[in-house]
Amino acid sequence: MGSSTGNMLVDREESLYRIFATSPLLLMAHCESTSIIEANIRAFKKKYKGQNDFPVRYHSRIRSVEACYASSALAVQMAKDTGARLHIAHVSTARELELFERKPIEEKKITAEAVIAHLMFSTEDYDTLGTRIKCNPAVKTPEDRAALREALTNGLIDVVATDHAPHLESEKLGGALRAVSGMPMIQFSLVSMLELSEMGVLPIERIPDLMAHNPAKLFHIEKRGFIRPGYYADLVLVDPDANWQVREGRYYTKCGWTPMDERFFKWRVSRTIMNGITAYSNGIVVDGVRGKELRFEI
């Protein structure tokens, strides 16, 4: 429902309504109003005549709070009208949180997700990180970030995801219009959440709910997301007293960069077990270990 990286836009209301009314599956939506975004771009081009790009800090005003809220509100209303199951991805604003209910995930037909970028960064970080934190939806104000953090524990946010988008650094050149949106985020997603717990944002017990249990429940993923007899052994061991700094050579994404560079973390992933097999241990990625396709209980 919002134009982002890739050709996946569906924004005609009649088409959307048909999808909402007929799909037996959980619908997952990226919600930004393309018409509002395009109007904002036109306004900036009029203001800065002759310029084909703008400083990256304007990205959050182009992909604005209004653009996010208008699209999310439309999706929620369609879900209510049709009875569809809806999951809104990467909610980025305090205002959007007004659309969701505080109750157990098992009782919800409309759920919401936050991503690491919006929980860790804000518009104040553009000055130091520039296009490295350019993503869609854009990072918002510190007040929006605070509201998202609070929603991790008050029942409004059900899932935390990575929105992992490992673009090359060369693709991140430019400003608000030219630089590609997205950032690599898988490697530092869990330690970021553990740091938020350390800061008192959420209890540590809430992290597996948001990052493992609830995704498995929502998408009916077979034998994943829980430590149970008969389930696949997908486990992570962490060191709570590592006290380390992110440096080049300490990250594993093939794109070769991270917005977390030079950040200090107290926690560190020490071992990753996938399908019962150690895939990573104390800085060493084990060659030849491969994942398995997910299966869904429909």
Question: Language-model segments: which ranges?
Answer:
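C-terminal cap of metal-dependent C-N hydrolases
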Residues: 175, 229-295
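Histidine/acidic residue-rich metal-binding segments in metalloenzymes
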Residues: 2, 6-160
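Anionic group-transfer/hydrolysis microenvironments
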Residues: 32, 92, 115, 165, ...
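His/Asp/Glu-enriched, well-ordered alpha-helical/loop segment
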Residues: 52-83, 132, 153-154, 158-160, ...
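Short, glycine- and charge-enriched coil/turn segments that flank and shape catalytic ligand pockets
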Residues: 105-107, 126-129, 174, 200-201, ...
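Glycine-rich, flexible loop/turn motifs
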Residues: 115, 131, 135, 179-182, ...
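Glycine/Thr-rich phosphate-binding loops of Rossmann-like dinucleotide-binding domains
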Residues: 37, 97, 120, 168-170, ...
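C-terminal/domain-terminus segments
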Residues: 96-102, 288-298
